[in-house]
């Protein structure tokens, strides 16, 4: 009888990536098949996020529901991973004894052994260590699920912003070898992937080893990824302003595969608050980066993160944030009311901004950015946009839908063979959350660049260094 696995994922795109790898790994080692119904599962996994307030309480609330399932089926295995698991460790089992497996973001590759341990000994296992890059060497080959794919290039963060738990839950920055990344992307391209999104907590800090012992910078990696035949669109997230160097900006100038859209978190427009956050840059320095980016790529759109109501934030601080929003003309944002995270320096600061004031400020900021986004959408009417067709439209199954470089959904009339390919459309109308387009040309009529085939990358000879890290050599 087929064993079934249910995974509940909370949090960022990195968590989504990790969960997909867990599913592939356990399918290859134990034959687990995914199910959306927890009651059907033989194994329940919760991949957690600790960025937002009350993350732990959400975890224990769901575990309370899963406990009832385990009472009905004592053979059911329950595992908790991700950042809350990394933070809580053994304490998590003290509050929820029904949990059998506790693993951190860097130890998900050990899940098969942990599950075998539970099945063989009927005793729990906890592994929240930080074994650096080992996780990537033990995960199964990538599997494409449509024309877009996420690829993790690094883990962790060294910045220790005062509000953030990432360095404590995912560890410090560790970069994957560049050849491993290119090999994975070439495999995905061979399966029909056309767009890759490079993932990391701080991708522009990437410094990966090459097969000849050199170091590959993030700018170099972007060019190498863009050169793989079949990969015609490259994205990345997330970046830190202090490492957004000129060589990365130069890639925007000469590499058309890199999209005209950038998510660059700033958090606040107030230099005083930025200092308290330990962001290590000013609002003016942030704007200087954006100015240079727009010189290199005039049509680039910018999104960002904002924390509203950070301890000590005054009305003047908030007004400076709103000035930055207008000056940069952000297209979209992930904006939240500040919530203290246990163990971070900011958690010890007096939170002297009222909840009502925080909510009001957040509403003002989100309303302004929504207004700017609509203005940008209206400016796209009459322009020609290249979109990657992802499938049928959610609004009309007789139509297709795809995304522009700046992440707008475009609905248009087309034929099924266009799915997974690029088309050029003219934007003719704007709606609240999408655009309307008219087909102008298909991929067969485009002059897409070809540099290196996926097969030529895959054909490289694999060698392993003394640490067992795979290297690929021509």
From Swiss-Prot:
GO cellular component: cytosol
Binding site for [4Fe-4S] cluster 2: 157, 161, 164
Domain Radical SAM core: start-end pairs: 143-375
Entry-linked SMART domains: Elp3 (SM00729)
EC assignment: 2.8.4.3
Enzymatic reactions: N(6)-dimethylallyladenosine(37) in tRNA + (sulfur carrier)-SH + AH2 + 2 S-adenosyl-L-methionine = 2-methylsulfanyl-N(6)-dimethylallyladenosine(37) in tRNA + (sulfur carrier)-H + 5'-deoxyadenosine + L-methionine + A + S-adenosyl-L-homocysteine + 2 H(+)
Residues involved in [4Fe-4S] cluster 1 binding: 12, 49, 83
Cited SUPFAM superfamilies: Radical SAM enzymes
Similarity annotation: Belongs to the methylthiotransferase family. MiaB subfamily.
Name of the molecule in the record: tRNA-2-methylthio-N(6)-dimethylallyladenosine synthase
Lineage: Bacteria, Pseudomonadati, Pseudomonadota, Gammaproteobacteria, Enterobacterales
Gene behind the chain: miaB
């Amino acid at each position: 009888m087929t064993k079934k696995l249910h995974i509940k994922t909370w949090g960022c795109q990195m968590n989504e990536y990790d969960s997909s790898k867990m599913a592939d790994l356990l399918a290859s080692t134990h034959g687990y098949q995914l199910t959306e119904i927890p009651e059907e599962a033989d194994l329940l996994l919760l991949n957690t996020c600790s960025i937002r307030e009350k993350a732990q309480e959400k975890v224990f609330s769901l575990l309370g529901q899963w406990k009832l399932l385990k009472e009905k089926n004592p053979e059911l295995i329950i595992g908790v991973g991700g950042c809350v698991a990394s933070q809580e460790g053994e304490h998590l089992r003290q509050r929820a004894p029904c949990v059998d497996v506790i693993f951190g973001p860097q130890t998900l590759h050990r899940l098969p052994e942990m599950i075998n341990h539970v099945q063989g000994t009927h005793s729990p296992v906890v592994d929240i260590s930080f074994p650096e890059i080992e996780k990537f060497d033990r995960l199964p080959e990538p599997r494409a699920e449509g024309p877009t794919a996420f690829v993790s290039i690094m883990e962790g963060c060294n910045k220790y912003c005062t509000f953030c738990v990432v360095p404590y839950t995912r560890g410090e920055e560790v970069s994957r070898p560049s050849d491993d990344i290119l090999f994975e992307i070439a495999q995905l391209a061979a399966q029909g992937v056309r767009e890759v999104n490079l993932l990391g907590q701080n991708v522009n800090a990437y410094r990966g080893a090459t097969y000849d012992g050199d170091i590959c910078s993030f700018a170099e990696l972007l060019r190498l990824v863009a050169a793989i035949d079949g990969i015609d669109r490259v994205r990345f997230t997330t970046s830190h302003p202090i490492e957004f160097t000129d060589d990365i900006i130069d890639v925007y100038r000469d590499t058309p595969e890199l999209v005209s859209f950038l998510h660059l978190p700033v958090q606040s427009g107030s230099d005083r608050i930025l200092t308290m956050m330990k962001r290590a840059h000013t609002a003016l320095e942030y704007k200087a980066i954006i100015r240079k980016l727009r010189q290199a790529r005039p049509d680039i759109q910018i999104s960002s993160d904002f924390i509203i109501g950070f301890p000590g934030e005054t009305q003047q601080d908030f007004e400076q944030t709103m000035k930055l929003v207008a000056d940069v003309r952000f297209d979209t944002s992930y904006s939240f009311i500040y919530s203290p995270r246990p163990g971070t320096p900011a958690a010890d600061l007096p939170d002297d901004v009222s909840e009502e004031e925080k909510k009001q400020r957040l509403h003002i900021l989100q309303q302004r950015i929504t207004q700017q986004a609509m203005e940008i959408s209206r400016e796209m009417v009459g322009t020609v946009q290249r979109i990657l067709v992802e499938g049928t439209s959610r609004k009309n199954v007789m139509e297709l839908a795809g995304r522009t470089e700046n992440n707008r959904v475009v609905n248009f009339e087309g034929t099924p063979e266009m799915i997974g390919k690029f088309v050029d459309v003219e934007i003719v109308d704007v709606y609240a959350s999408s655009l309307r387009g008219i087909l102008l040309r298909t991929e067969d009529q485009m002059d897409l660049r070809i540099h290196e085939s996926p097969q030529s990358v895959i054909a490289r000879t694999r060698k392993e260094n003394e640490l067992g890290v795979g290297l690929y050599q021509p």
